[in-house]
């Protein structure tokens, strides 16, 4: 599938491999409000992305979109040296601290992880960036300038992600990361 997407992207971009952007879209319309998304790329697919100098890999999961830049793809290839599994799932809010629960409220919480086939997990990339966009439709009661992305730490505390912001045009909360963790949409009081 990935090889087909790369070939399609090359044709669409007139063979300009330097600016090649590959997009994988999950058909979430049938799933409605999905609980789990799982993308497995074998070692050949990861190698092909790096070999073709793909500028970015976009993984569109409906509620959550991840965009890996070329440095992140190279780092994943280097770190995993095998197949790569990208997982996005709705997280359980039971583990949130009381304070985090107030910040997050009924807003979405997701777990992101990247593992190799041998269950080796990547938590932080040494190089590269991942742009994350989480769908969220702000209510009229919420001040859009107070909506941010929060990292949920191992104690259930919510830590605001620097540079995160709400985009009212796309109705997404956006941030850039080097790591994989539990993230939530929250609103400052």
Language model segments and positions:
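Short, solvent-exposed secondary-structure capping/transition elements
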Residues: 34, 97, 142-144
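Proteolytic cleavage junctions
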Residues: 103-189
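Generic structural motif
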Residues: 20, 27-31, 42-44, 53, ...
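A generic structural signal for beta-strand entry/edge sites
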Residues: 21-23, 34-36, 54-56, 63, ...
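Short aromatic-centered micro-motifs
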Residues: 39, 59, 151
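Self-processing/autoproteolytic domain segments and adjacent N-terminal interaction modules in large
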Residues: 51-127, 189
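Short amphipathic beta-strand and strand-loop transition segments with alternating hydrophobic
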Residues: 4-9, 88, 162-166
């Amino acid at each position: 599938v990935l090889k087909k997407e790369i070939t399609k992207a090359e044709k669409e971009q007139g063979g300009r491999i330097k600016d090649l952007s590959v997009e994988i879209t999950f058909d979430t319309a049938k799933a409605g409000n999905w609980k789990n998304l799982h993308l497995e790329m074998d070692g050949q697919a990861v190698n092909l992305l790096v070999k073709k100098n793909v500028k970015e890999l976009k993984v569109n999961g409906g509620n959550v979109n991840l965009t890996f830049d070329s440095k992140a793809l190279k780092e994943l290839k280097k770190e995993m040296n095998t197949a790569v599994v990208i997982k996005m799932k709705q997280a359980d809010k039971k583990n949130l601290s009381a304070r985090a629960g107030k910040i997050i409220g009924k807003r979405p919480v997701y777990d992101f992880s990247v593992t190799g086939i041998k269950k080796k997990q990547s938590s932080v990339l040494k190089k590269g960036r991942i742009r994350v966009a989480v769908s969220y439709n702000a209510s009229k009661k919420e001040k859009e300038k107070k909506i941010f992305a929060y990292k949920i730490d191992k104690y259930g505390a919510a830590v605001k992600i620097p540079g995160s912001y709400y985009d009212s045009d796309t109705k997404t909360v956006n941030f850039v990361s080097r790591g994989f963790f539990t993230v939530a949409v929250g609103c400052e009081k």
